[in-house]
Every structure is written in structure tokens, then in C-alpha cells.
From Swiss-Prot:
EC number: 1.5.1.5, 3.5.4.9
Family: Belongs to the tetrahydrofolate dehydrogenase/cyclohydrolase family.
Designated gene of the protein: folD
Gene Ontology biological process: L-histidine biosynthetic process; methionine biosynthetic process; purine nucleotide biosynthetic process; tetrahydrofolate interconversion
GO cellular component terms attached to this protein's record: cytosol
Coiled coil: none
Protein name per Swiss-Prot or TrEMBL: Bifunctional protein FolD
Length: 281
């Protein structure tokens, strides 16, 4: 059995078309959804991510402002810019690209963003809302993963979901989202004693560690759904995920590829969050 692919590019195109339609409806009312992207320093990967986010906004009817500052920018100066964006009525979402230079406290900066403009879903108010099941902005990557499961009509009720990774950006919010859909959730991490024993019980596996081949074919039960959040490079320098794709695709029922899986969905859900922020006006 070869797994069916969950195509993140195709699903993104569908969702972005809907974003563009809703953005046009807002513009007809005199509201252009606006995203401010703040980049500090010259991290090459961050520059690529930021360009992709800005382009996605422009391609789908959203207004995007890129503020690029030198790495020497002080924490106080960055906080002042965030406060100014909080008070800008043309901006509905604020994204501060991580990582930040070492002299800037990323937590302090994220907490300075107004919760109503926290379209990355990283603010403690967003995390708390997710925890207790209240409306709020969901972090874009796990939100995209949930949309992928939804796209295949997968009913999570009563299913065992294993999340590999416990980051605040993916692992923890992913577990909460799965729990909201009535899955039984296990979170695995670097101190988990027998990862294979856990994953072999799983109906759904989300790999979000940032380490190649953390999930191999012998760790997956036949027919399981495998979501690969990882972004790594193999020995040839090619993009790969956390999952041994070639092996696991022969066992799993569904699998997401890297590239072309979760990656495009992350940016798409950023657009959705920004749009929904503007629609609340």
C-alpha cells in the first residue's frame, strides 16, 4: 500500500482563493486587510520567509508592510515600533519574524503585540484562549495541519494522535487542537523513553522536531495519517522533513510531502488570521 499524498500546495490554492474573495468583499466596504511584517537583522532564511509572506499578501488582496531593521536595533526601539503598529488602524495583523538578535527578548516583544493583532498566535492570550477553547488566533503551522486533516475528511473523535515535539509554536498548540476535536493525544519529546512504542499505537502522527528521520517505517502502523512539519536538509542539500518519506509512504494511509506539504499551509493560515482580524471590525 502506498499512502495518499495530502497536497499542501493544492489545498493552499483553494484556501487562498477564498481569502482573496473575502478580502475583496472587505475592500468593497473600504477596509483593506493589513499585515505588518517586522524583520530585524540579516538572517538569510528569515529574509526568504518574510518575502514569501509579503508576496502571499499582495497576491491575495491584502495590504502588507515590511519593516526591515538592522541587527543593532535596540529592544526598546523594537518595542516602540510594535506599540506604534498596535495603534495603526490600517494594520490588522503584526508578525515579528523570529529568531531575533540575542540582545532582544523575544518573549517580551511577542507579549507587546496587541492580542487582537497577534496573527502568529504566539501571545499568551492566544495560547490561553486555545487551552480553554475560546475564540482566538491559532498558531499558523498547527492550524494548517488541522486544515489538512479536515481536507481528507478525517474524523479525529476517539483516534489516538501522537505529536512528536513540544515547542510552543507547533507541538503544544497542535496537541490542544487535536484534543478539541476529541482525539486522545500523546505528546512525545526528547525525554520520551520508547518513541516507537508510542507511535505504533497512533492513528495520527505529527512530527515536529526539526530532525531528519525521527519517524521511520517500522514506527508507523499500517494506514496511519502522517503529518510532517519538519524542515531540514539531507546530505545532498535537498529539503526534507522529519519523516523518512520514502519508507513511511509504503506503510501510512496518508502522508504530507516536504516540500509542498505543511510549509505552504503555514503562510496560508497567516493570511486567514489576518483576514479574520480585519473582518472583526
Amino acid at each position: 500500500m502506498t499512502a495518499q499524498l495530502i497536497d499542501g500546495n493544492a489545498l493552499s490554492r483553494q484556501l487562498r482563493a477564498e481569502v482573496a474573495r473575502r478580502a475583496a468583499a472587505l475592500r468593497a466596504r473600504g477596509i483593506t486587510p493589513g499585515l505588518a511584517v517586522v524583520l530585524v537583522g540579516e538572517n538569510p532564511a528569515s529574509q526568504v520567509y518574510v518575502r514569501n509572506k509579503v508576496k502571499a499578501c499582495q497576491d491575495n488582496g491584502l495590504h502588507s508592510v515590511l519593516e526591515h531593521y538592522p541587527a543593532a536595533l535596540s529592544e526598546a526601539e523594537l518595542l516602540a515600533r510594535v506599540h506604534a503598529l498596535n495603534n495603526d488602524p490600517a494594520i490588522h495583523g503584526i508578525l515579528v519574524q523570529l529568531p531575533l538578535p540575542a540582545h532582544i527578548d523575544a518573549h517580551k516583544v511577542i507579549e507587546a503585540i496587541a492580542p487582537g493583532k497577534d496573527v502568529d498566535g504566539f501571545h499568551v492570550a492566544s495560547a490561553g484562549a486555545l487551552m480553554v477553547g475560546q475564540p482566538g488566533f491559532w498558531p499558523c503551522t498547527p492550524y494548517g495541519c488541522m486544515k489538512m486533516l479536515e481536507s481528507i475528511g478525517y474524523d479525529l473523535r476517539g483516534k489516538h494522535a501522537v505529536v512528536i515535539g513540544r515547542s510552543n509554536i507547533v507541538g503544544k498548540p497542535m496537541a490542544m487542537m487535536l484534543l478539541q476535536k476529541n482525539a486522545t493525544v500523546t505528546i512525545c519529546h526528547s525525554a520520551t523513553k520508547d518513541l516507537k512504542a508510542m507511535t505504533l499505537q497512533a492513528d495520527v502522527i505529527v512530527a515536529a522536531v526539526g530532525k531528519r528521520n525521527v519517524l521511520t517505517a517500522d514506527m508507523v502502523k499500517p494506514g496511519a495519517v502522517v503529518i510532517d512539519v519538519g524542515m531540514n536538509r539531507n546530505d545532498e542539500g535537498k529539503l526534507c522533513g522529519d519523516v523518512d518519506f520514502e519508507g513511511v509512504k509504503e506503510v501510512a494511509g496518508y502522508i504530507t510531502p516536504v516540500p509542498g506539504g505543511v510549509g505552504p499551509m503555514t503562510i496560508t493560515m497567516l493570511l486567514v488570521n489576518t483576514l479574520e482580524s480585519a473582518e472583526r471590525l
